[in-house]
């Protein structure tokens, strides 16, 4: 028996078998159970501790119920809808009148009162008819019951509050000691967009220390919000009247964008990628053939020209790259063919979902598509993962990365493009998706999905990561409908995980477009496409960079690399000479030779976050030197040529830290 398992006898309550107040539930196989449940047989279960990942989820789930309990105590007319656990916390939606920050404080105090009472939380099972009676005054719960309950289901009760829920929960409200309500928002009811619900966000942790650390990080995150930094550094314009959701880059912002593109061009070039360009608009026939029309139509910008032809602004770059690849025939020796493009795509998002650079309606991807043989998958995936590691290490420095492998859910083949084999006539059909597949030869519906292509590609992705010593998690059912994929996340300076890179295998777009090559035996064989984006998108990547570095970007990315200040007007000419030397050396430099004091000039330029402030006075002019101040406030005097070499070296190496 594993060391973390506990033996429980038939008829024994889990709580009695464990008798450890740090344990809040048990896990039996893949199922979580309340401590008050009784073992149906002699069995081994795993204890779920409050401070574990699973324990934190259960704690926050219980905190959401605690929130609903407090709200309905204070606002009896409020109708609870749903209250899920989300990243870093939870929320609950209510049909009620809008509330204020003052109300939020009162709700939190009521939650604390219920916690202090240490109310037991009990699980009870009812039939569907009984559930409909219990929640007869709440149309939101009635809908959930009618859509999800067939025979019986569970509710959880704490004092006078009862909620529909599968559980599990902490044993009593006294376990929810460290929590905080964070904000109020408006949420649209998914079944009726005219109905606005009140959404209350909160978080909970196993202890006050963890909660305090999280709240401190939240405050720091507000200071690092990329939208705030963008305004301070004058990087982009967001105009809700003329271009809602379409960011426009200022000269400063375009510098960062161009440097990122330049670096990706370098990484692409040394790994065999060639640059292409594709238009922003295509006839809708290409989107229908690619499958994007069916999947993305609600998010596409579509229009009809006077001649009657229908067009769509591209939501993806891949069909354009496919059109370029399809211009000629290929031998097996020609593959892989790798196309890359900083391609801008356009996707409609509801106005309430658009925000800053992380959720725009137009964004530029460092998009790449390679056309390969099936036997090349492992090698090419390893190359791509190497590009990911090199890129993130260069840009962020020593940063934690996490890798996810999204695979097919074989229990639901209808969600994926698959090959099917007719059990009656043996005919094989490629690239079908749906629930009622018909054989085009004998018209039988007795069709078996063939997972072999998916299995082969998925195993090659595993092999690639295993051979590189990469630890990864697998997520069944998270694959795209046309193939398995790898997602790469990074952890920023505040400990937040951000999904950036995607490496996606695609077997079925080659079927849609008839993409083949001639193999070594002279026969036509289908190519495989790998879609990849290392940054993800330049917009999102820039937002994460700004927040990670709090706007103090590495010098090679910083719009103003040096800011030259004369001590007085007598040294203004020397300051201009120093600035020209920097500009001539390719350094992005600005001189402020105005009449303000040095301290005032430094204060004025603070929000622009230059890499170095160069101060020159009479002594520097006499000695042909410069006094350089770094971002930490440390100053050092260099000869002019010496400083030029130092900063040029820092930029050329794309160093994350400063030279001193």
From Swiss-Prot:
* Span list, region Catalytic: 225-554
**Gene Ontology CC: one annotated term:** cytoplasm
Q: Which UniProt keywords apply?
A: Aminoacyl-tRNA synthetase, ATP-binding, Cytoplasm, Ligase, Metal-binding, Nucleotide-binding, Protein biosynthesis, RNA-binding, tRNA-binding, Zinc
What residues does the TGS domain cover?
1-49
Q: Extract the GO molecular function terms from the UniProt entry.
A: aminoacyl-tRNA deacylase activity; ATP binding; metal ion binding; threonine-tRNA ligase activity; tRNA binding
Q: Where does Zn(2+) bind?
A: 318, 369, 531
Q: Which SMART domains match?
A: tRNA_SAD
- Which EC class heads this enzyme's classification? ligase
Pfam families reported for this sequence: HGTP_anticodon (PF03129), tRNA-synt_2b (PF00587), tRNA_SAD (PF07973)
Subcellular location per UniProt equals: Cytoplasm
PANTHER family named among the record's database cross-references: THREONINE--TRNA LIGASE, CHLOROPLASTIC_MITOCHONDRIAL 2, THREONINE-TRNA LIGASE
Q: Which family does it belong to?
A: Belongs to the class-II aminoacyl-tRNA synthetase family.
Q: What is this protein called?
A: Threonine--tRNA ligase
Which species is listed as the source?
Thermoplasma volcanium (strain ATCC 51530 / DSM 4299 / JCM 9571 / NBRC 15438 / GSS1)
